[in-house]
C-alpha cells in the first residue's frame, strides 16, 4: 500500500510517501515545479520514491488557502482548485498550481484537504475572521494526533506564523498568518501598512508579505537571518526575539481556548524557525513550559497519514468531514 501527502509550503512543495512501515520524503522548490510539465512532476515523484503512479493507493493534496470547500473530498469534485479566489495573502509562483493539476489529471486517486474558514466546524467565535489556516497545517496537526496526542496547540513558525488548537482530536480554532504573530517575511497589517495601502503605495498582499520581522533587519531572506543568528548578530537576534514573543502570545491565546473546552494540552513547534533552537528556548521561557519540536516534513507526512486513514475508511479527520469516495 502506498500513500502520498503533498504540502503546498511557502517556499517549496514537499512530498511524503508512506509505504508499509517506511516513510520517504523529497521536495521541489515552487519555482522549480512551475517550470516543469505535469508529466515531469509525476515522473519526478516516481523516481524519487521508486514507485509507479499506478501503484499509488491515494494522494492527499493541499493547495493554497483551500477556502472554497470545507470537507475532505475527491480532488476531481472540486470547483476550480477549491479556492474562492486566486487573490489573497501570499506569493504566486505557479508551482503549487502545476503540482495540483498534475495530480488532478494523472488518474491517480486523490483527495483535497480544505483550509479552515467561516464554513468550517470550529468554535463559532473564531469565525470573526474569514480564514483561519491553510490546509497543510491540518497535516501537521494530524501527524501530532497520530503520535498519540488528543489535546494540543501547534504553532508553525517560518515565513509566517500560524497556530492551531486541537481539543478531543478536533481542531477548534486557529490564528492565521495575517491576523497576529509575524513570521520572518509575513505578518498582519499595522497602521502604517494600512495607510500605505490606502494611499496606493502598495497592495494589501504586498504589505502582508513585507510585514514580518525581517523588516527590522538588514538581511534579505530567512536563510541569511538564521545564519546571522547563529553568529549572534544583534539584528538577527532581535528579529527572532520578536518572532518568539509573538508566537508565545499566540500559543497562550490558543491555550485559553482549550480551557473553554475543559482541557489543557502539549505545545508543539513546527517550521524552519520553530525548529531553531534559539527560538525554542525563548518560547519555552515565555510560556514556562516545555515545547516539543517537529521538522519541516511533518505537514507532508501528516497529509500522507490522512490519505492512509481515509483509504481505510475514516469518515472524520480532526473534526473535518470526509466525503470520499
Curated annotation (Swiss-Prot):
Annotated SUPFAM superfamilies: Actin-like ATPase domain (SSF53067)
- All disulfide bonds of the chain are none
Residues of the signal sequence?
none
Tell me the domain of life.
Archaea
Q: Which InterPro entries does the annotation name?
A: ATPase_NBD, Methan_mark_12
Which NCBIfam families does the record match to this protein? methan_mark_12
Family per UniProt?
Belongs to the UPF0285 family.
Q: Which HAMAP family match?
A: UPF0285
According to UniProt, the name of this protein is: UPF0285 protein Mbar_A0208
Give the organism the record lists.
Methanosarcina barkeri (strain Fusaro / DSM 804)
Amino acid at each position: 500500500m502506498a500513500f502520498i501527502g503533498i504540502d503546498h509550503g511557502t517556499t517549496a512543495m514537499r512530498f511524503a510517501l508512506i509505504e508499509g512501515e517506511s516513510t520517504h520524503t523529497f521536495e521541489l522548490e515552487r519555482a522549480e515545479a512551475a517550470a516543469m510539465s505535469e508529466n515531469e512532476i509525476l515522473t519526478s515523484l516516481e523516481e524519487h520514491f521508486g514507485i509507479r503512479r499506478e501503484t499509488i493507493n491515494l494522494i492527499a493534496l493541499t493547495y493554497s488557502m483551500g477556502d472554497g470547500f470545507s470537507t475532505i473530498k475527491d480532488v476531481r469534485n472540486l470547483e476550480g482548485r477549491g479556492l474562492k479566489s486566486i487573490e489573497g495573502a501570499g506569493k504566486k509562483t505557479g508551482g503549487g498550481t502545476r503540482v495540483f493539476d498534475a495530480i488532478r489529471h494523472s488518474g491517480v486517486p486523490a483527495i483535497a484537504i480544505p483550509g479552515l474558514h467561516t464554513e468550517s466546524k470550529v468554535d463559532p467565535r473564531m469565525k470573526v475572521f474569514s480564514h483561519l489556516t491553510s490546509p497543510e497545517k491540518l497535516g501537521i496537526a494530524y501527524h501530532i494526533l497520530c503520535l498519540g496526542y488528543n489535546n494540543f496547540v501547534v504553532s508553525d513558525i517560518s515565513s509566517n506564523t500560524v497556530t492551531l488548537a486541537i481539543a478531543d482530536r478536533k481542531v477548534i480554532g486557529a490564528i492565521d498568518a495575517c491576523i497576529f504573530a509575524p513570521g520572518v517575511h509575513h505578518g498582519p497589517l499595522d497602521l502604517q501598512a494600512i495607510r500605505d495601502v490606502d494611499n496606493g503605495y502598495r497592495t494589501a498582499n504586498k504589505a502582508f508579505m513585507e510585514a514580518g520581522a525581517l523588516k527590522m533587519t538588514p538581511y534579505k531572506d530567512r536563510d541569511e537571518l538564521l545564519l546571522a543568528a547563529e553568529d549572534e548578530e544583534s539584528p538577527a537576534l532581535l528579529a527572532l526575539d520578536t518572532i518568539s514573543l509573538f508566537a508565545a502570545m499566540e500559543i497562550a491565546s490558543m491555550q485559553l481556548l482549550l480551557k473553554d473546552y475543559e482541557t489543557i494540552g502539549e505545545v508543539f513547534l513546527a517550521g524552519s524557525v520553530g525548529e531553531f533552537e534559539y527560538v525554542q528556548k525563548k518560547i519555552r521561557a515565555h510560556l514556562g513550559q516545555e515545547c516539543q519540536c517537529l521538522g519541516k516534513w511533518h505537514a507532508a507526512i501528516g497529509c500522507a497519514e490522512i490519505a492512509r486513514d481515509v483509504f481505510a475508511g475514516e469518515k472524520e479527520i480532526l473534526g473535518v468531514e470526509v466525503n470520499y469516495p
